Structures are given as structure tokens and as C-alpha cells.
Amino acid sequence: MYSIKMRASHEDIHISGAETMCEFEDLENYLKKYFNKAFNHENGNIDFLNLKIEKVKAPIQTLVALPVVENLNDTLTQLAKQTGVSEYALNKGLEFIKNDITYTGAIILSAQTGQRLDSTEQRGIRVTQLAFKTCKCNGEISERVKDARALATCINAFEGVKAELCVSDDLHYTTGYFASPKLGYRRIFNIKEKGTRHGGRIIFVDEGINLNAYVSFLETVPKEIIEK
């Protein structure tokens, strides 16, 4: 297996990114796919593109994908309450999402106090070394959901994680999601207005979580997601 990562930006502002793990014979297809994604993204033109390929040497951990639960009546406040995330912590997370800073990774907050627990500043925590081995999906929208579920599954597969809130920073994509070990993966429609780059990924955790081990799991452990 090989890890392939793409990051594209304009004047150091993040435009697009993608990542997966695949077999050698699939590398060329992913390189073409990520190249085209970078140069044809709705967020604008790029002046920098990085494509990185590494052989996966560490053992791969298998994770079962979070179930997709569709409920048009879901609200963030209700979901947060059901997963042990305080209203104050939820609002702090939304502040990070709505500010004008572009974070390239996730932000970790206390689910109780809303205090930021990671110290990565604008970089954030990057979930890497992952691939969705099997997925019952098709079409462009389902491709987005597949990638999002893979990330959500990894983020929520560690003791002490309460939930995750994600809002895309793509200009015209207004569907976000709220995911948790307890409630699964739930899309939230019209979570932001069209035409804005506001977005971000917030992870709500217990303050007693082994933060160093969690970050290492997200950033360095190879993870393969499968359907149940």
C-alpha cells in the first residue's frame, strides 16, 4: 500500500486537499484525479501544488465506518446535547468555523468547557494515512460523503472523543455534518451561506483524553475503513 496526499494553495491560503491509501497499480489514477481537483477547484486558482507519495510500512488498523443517519429535523444544539457537548463548547466551535482564519487541520476542544486543547495554532491536527476500502456509494455527492465518513470514522474511533463538527470551506457547498460514536454520521443541510470560505473541523473530547496518543493515532497510524 502507498499513501498519497495532495495539498494546493494560493498565496499560502488553502484551496484544496485530498488523501488516500492505495495499491501501486492505482497510483496513476489517483495522481490524475488529485491533479485535476487541484487545478479545477471552485475555491479558485492555485499557485502551489504538493503531491506526496509514501510507502505504508506500519501495520494498518481496520475501522468500521460510522453509520449514516439521515434526519432532516436534526439541529446542532440537539445533537450536541445528546453527545455530552455543552452548548458553550458548541458555540466556541462555531466561532472557530466562522472566523476569517483558514485552519488546515482539525481543532480539538474540551466538550465541557470549550477550551482549545491542542497547541497547533493555524495548522490544526491533520488526519492522515487513511482509505475507505469498500463503500456502497456512487456519484459525486456520494464521493464527498465517502471521504467525509472516512475522516469522521477515524476521528471518532478513540476513547474520550464525544463528537465532531465539520463545515466545508468550499464556496458553494453548504452541507456539513455532525458525527459521534453514539449517533453516527449525520449530515446537516444549509449549515452556512453560499459564497463564503468559512469552514473547519472541530473535535469535542473529554478533558481526560490521552491527547498525545490521540493525535499520534490521527496523524501517523495507517487506517483502513470498511463497511459493516
Curated annotation (Swiss-Prot):
EC number: 6.2.1.14
Enzyme class at the top of the EC tree: ligase
Pathway listed: Metabolic intermediate metabolism; pimeloyl-CoA biosynthesis; pimeloyl-CoA from pimelate: step 1/1
Catalytic activity: heptanedioate + ATP + CoA = 6-carboxyhexanoyl-CoA + AMP + diphosphate
Molecular function in Gene Ontology: 6-carboxyhexanoate-CoA ligase activity; ATP binding; magnesium ion binding
Keywords from the UniProt entry: ATP-binding, Biotin biosynthesis, Ligase, Magnesium, Nucleotide-binding
Record bears the keyword Nucleotide-binding: yes
One Gene Ontology biological process: biotin biosynthetic process
Pfam families cross-referenced by the UniProt entry: BioW
UniProt xrefs under InterPro entries: BioW (IPR005499)
Highest taxon above the source species: Bacteria
Function noted in UniProt: Catalyzes the transformation of pimelate into pimeloyl-CoA with concomitant hydrolysis of ATP to AMP.
Family (UniProt): Belongs to the BioW family.
Protein's UniProt name: 6-carboxyhexanoate--CoA ligase
Gene from which the chain derives: bioW
